[in-house]
Amino acid sequence: MSIISSSIGRCAALAVLAASVAFGGTANADTVEKIADTSRLVSVGGAVTEIVYALGAGDKLVARDQTSTYPEEARKLVDVGYMRRLSPEGVLSVNPTGILLSEGSGPPETLEVLKKATVPIAMIPDDHTAKSVIEKIEMVGKALGLEDKAKALAADVSRDLETAQKISANQNPRKRVLFIMSAQDGRITASGTGTGANGIITLAGGVNAIDSYQGYKQLTDEAVEKAAPDLILTMGIGKDSVQKEDLLKNPVLASSPAGRSGNIVQ
């Protein structure tokens, strides 16, 4: 999402997208705040993985989920599957000493098995406000025993966010942004409110063009036309990557303000 990098910096973007991290300690424990042995970690959640690398602890990771595609080194790690369709066997197959688990991961039965295992897990609540960005960095840092580095990173991101807020305060009217998660077979799945994408749009000074629902849903042509986005933001990497040329084959998107101006960012 290069538009975010230009507005608030890569650090802020990764933190906004971060969901929560949870480590389950003993056999019947739910979560812990700090992992004693961080030598072999599994990270589930793209932003959590980015934070780990930003803290200089990427060498501790042995596996990641499919949403963890940045930085490039992360893609070389063992892939344990999509964060919402994890299998306990896949996660535990790499013999982790700790699991960084984003809130929203699942399914529930997998989480129950992981919590009953002897591998520590830590859960960080998923939120997308400026305040929660800083809290997530600090919580990941605490989980890894890297509090000082986390404090420094949080300070950098805080400055980026303040800069972004100053920039966005001068934007009038604010750009209407449509985040498209996928466009498989011409069917547009886009972000409503209550998502990491919505949080990024807001922090970057934009307005989500879709505010009629929470989460991700398929849009009708009428809904796309009504959204009238000034900017279309899409996935640039991974299995859900969407190409600009493919989007412009959709006549409704092509005729939108973003389509007419070619204002499509991956």
Region locations from a protein language model:
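A ligand-binding cleft/hinge motif common to bilobed small-molecule-binding domains
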Residues: 105-116, 234-250
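Bacterial N-terminal signal peptides that target proteins for export
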Residues: 2-15
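Short helices/loops that flank or line small-molecule/ion binding pockets
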Residues: 88-95, 220-228
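A short, structured surface patch at a secondary-structure boundary
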Residues: 40-94, 98-105
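Sec/Tat signal peptide C-region and signal peptidase I cleavage site
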Residues: 23-29
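Short secondary-structure boundary segments
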Residues: 45, 103-104, 126, 213, ...
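Extracytoplasmic substrate-binding proteins
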Residues: 34-40, 109-185, 210-212, 262-266
